[in-house]
Curated annotation (Swiss-Prot):
Gene expressing this chain: rpmE2
One Pfam family, short name: Ribosomal_L31
Natural source organism: Yersinia pestis
GO annotation, biological process: translation
Entries under HAMAP family matching the protein: Ribosomal_bL31_2 (MF_00502)
Keyword Endoplasmic reticulum: no
Protein's recorded name: Large ribosomal subunit protein bL31B
């Protein structure tokens, strides 16, 4: 295996700005910013969305109609599809 070709693996603090949640995990992401937490200095990365704020994980996802697409189509355009008898 070739030496010095892999990025350094280190502990990084990710900050979800929309939920104001911090995650300390191992990562190879490159960043110039740092933050001090628990008496140590870590690389710092901001996130727009994470599991702390994503609607799928928070349970605040939008509910779609219980009917299928065919039922919605007939509801919207059903009057145009009825056969007229003269």
């Amino acid at each position: 295996m070739k030496p010095n070709i892999h990025p350094p693996y280190r502990t990084v603090v990710f900050h979800d700005t929309s939920a104001d949640a911090y995650f300390t995990v191992g990562s190879t992401i490159a960043t110039e910013r740092t933050i001090e937490r628990d008496g140590q200095t870590y690389p710092y990365v901001t996130l727009d969305i994470s599991s702390a704020s994503h609607p799928y994980y928070t349970g605040k996802q939008k509910e779609f109609a219980k009917e299928g697409s065919t039922a919605r189509f007939h509801q919207r355009f059903g009057s145009f599809l009825t056969k007229k008898t003269n």
